[in-house]
């Protein structure tokens, strides 16, 4: 038992040394540095708001070629799918019957005209009654009308193009019998230059646009407000620019939308009737638009857009946003961001907001550029 005081002293010395060593390590540990983040300073800018609406093309003019007399088709004088001019002959209907009718009408007119002239001389001599003269003169007028009708029928045996445009397939061939008033058209001609594009806009979008214009949030897009651009089915931009012609005065009850019609030059016939397209219309100008890069906007668990900003104390703040649409690589922000706010776009994984007034401190490195 003589060694007990020595053992106790040794244990005390080791414990003291361990305690002193731990204190030195705590004193030597450096303070955690605030993370560095990249930010974009929000600046208001003028932006022309556009609406991209779905639509379909339709011909500027459409005319169905129909016979106006009865007969057998002798010739078809056009190539299907070709361009035809107004007044160009398309078909020849057998004119034999109508030529005979015209000859008979001419002979009848000569006879009635001669009779009327003779009766005129006789009435001066009081050899015939006034009634007989009037009847002879009426027959002359009737013969003149019959001659004119026969001339028209003979002219109608040449079926002409009612408009200029591209003609489709022929529904009748040589030897087919056609008749005036038949239900089937012989062919259809469509004028493709210019060409219509009919697009639809929901009444909700239309009402919102009107409210924004009335409140001053949007301004009219100026002299080019009626200009329209066209995006084709393959995503390419149609090289010709069109103009808005009119909007429908009633709402479609089944779709709740309004039809807008635009007119486009189509000299190369790139656009064909029935094509599905998207039209870009200038809706208005927001003179103080707030645009936020998409990489600086995230979604919370409910799907609502949020953003982290650096306040004047270099602390991180969480902002709830109201974003209306994407514009290229940016979001158009309606609520939640103000001019001068520093939006964090890089280093989001290193920072997080805490309780109100206790946001995490951070250092701003060189301002991040927009994509």
Swiss-Prot record:
Q: What induces it?
A: The arpABC operon was not seen to be induced by carbenicillin, chloramphenicol, erythromycin nor by hexane, toluene or p-xylene.
How does this chain sit within the bilayer? Lipid-anchor
Q: Where is the lipid attached (N-palmitoyl cysteine)?
A: 23
Transmembrane region(s): none
Biological process GO terms, please?
A: response to antibiotic
Q: Does the keyword 4Fe-4S apply?
A: no
**Example of a GO MF term:** transmembrane transporter activity
Localization recorded for this chain is: Cell inner membrane
| Record SUPFAM superfamilies | HlyD-like secretion proteins
Regions annotated as coiled coil? 115-155
Among InterPro entries, the record links this protein to: CusB-like_dom_1, CusB_D23, MFP_Efflux, RND_pump_MFP
User: From which residue to which does the signal peptide run?
Assistant: 1-22
**Key words, A-Z:** Antibiotic resistance, Cell inner membrane, Cell membrane, Coiled coil, Lipoprotein, Membrane, Palmitate, Signal, Transport
- Signal found in the keyword field: yes
Q: Name one GO cellular component term.
A: plasma membrane
Residues bearing a lipid moiety (S-diacylglycerol cysteine): 23
Record-stated family: Belongs to the membrane fusion protein (MFP) (TC 8.A.1) family.
Function as written in the Swiss-Prot or TrEMBL entry? The periplasmic linker protein component of an antibiotic efflux pump. Confers resistance to numerous structurally unrelated antibiotics such as carbenicillin, chloramphenicol, erythromycin, novobiocin, streptomycin and tetracycline. Is not involved in organic solvent efflux.
Q: Which PANTHER family match?
A: ACRA/E-RELATED COMPONENT OF DRUG EFFLUX TRANSPORTER, MULTIDRUG EFFLUX PUMP SUBUNIT ACRA-RELATED
The name of this protein is Antibiotic efflux pump periplasmic linker protein ArpA
Could you tell me which species this protein originates from?
Pseudomonas putida
Gene it is expressed from: arpA
């Amino acid at each position: 038992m003589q060694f007990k005081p020595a053992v106790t002293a040794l244990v005390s010395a080791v414990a003291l040394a361990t305690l002193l060593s731990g204190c030195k390590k705590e004193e030597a540990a450096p303070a955690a540095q605030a993370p560095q983040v990249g930010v974009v300073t929000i600046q208001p800018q003028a932006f022309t708001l556009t609406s991209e609406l779905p639509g379909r093309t339709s011909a500027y003019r459409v005319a169905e070629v129909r016979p106006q007399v009865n007969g057998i088709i002798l010739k078809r004088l056009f190539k299907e799918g070709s361009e035809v001019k107004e007044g160009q002959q398309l078909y020849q209907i057998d004119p034999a019957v109508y030529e005979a009718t015209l000859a008979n009408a001419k002979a009848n007119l000569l006879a009635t005209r001669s009779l009327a002239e003779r009766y005129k001389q006789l009435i001066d001599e009081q050899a015939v009654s006034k009634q007989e003269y009037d009847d002879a003169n009426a027959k002359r007028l009737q013969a003149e009308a019959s001659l004119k009708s026969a001339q028209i029928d003979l002219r109608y045996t040449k079926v002409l193009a009612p408009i200029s445009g591209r003609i489709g397939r022929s529904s009748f061939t040589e030897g087919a019998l056609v008749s005036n008033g038949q239900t089937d058209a012989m062919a259809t001609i469509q004028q493709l230059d210019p060409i219509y594009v009919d697009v639809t806009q929901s009444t909700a979008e239309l009402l919102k646009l009107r409210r924004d214009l009335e409140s001053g949030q949007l301004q009219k897009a100026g002299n080019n407000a009626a200009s329209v651009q066209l995006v084709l089915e393959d995503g390419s931009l149609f090289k010709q620019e069109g103009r808005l012609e009119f909007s429908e005065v009633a709402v479609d009850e089944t779709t709740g939308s309004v039809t807008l019609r635009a007119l486009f030059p189509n000299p190369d016939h790139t656009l064909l009737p029935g094509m599905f397209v998207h039209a870009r219309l200038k809706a208005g100008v927001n003179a103080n638009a707030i645009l936020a890069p998409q990489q600086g906007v995230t979604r919370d668990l409910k799907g609502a857009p949020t953003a982290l900003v650096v306040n004047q104390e270099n602390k991180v703040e969480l902002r709830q946003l109201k974003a209306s649409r994407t514009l290229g690589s940016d979001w158009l922000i309606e609520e939640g961001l103000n001019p001068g706010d520093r939006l964090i776009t890089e280093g989001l994984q290193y920072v997080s907001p805490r309780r109100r007034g206790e946001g995490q401190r951070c250092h701003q490195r060189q301002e991040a550029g927009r994509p």
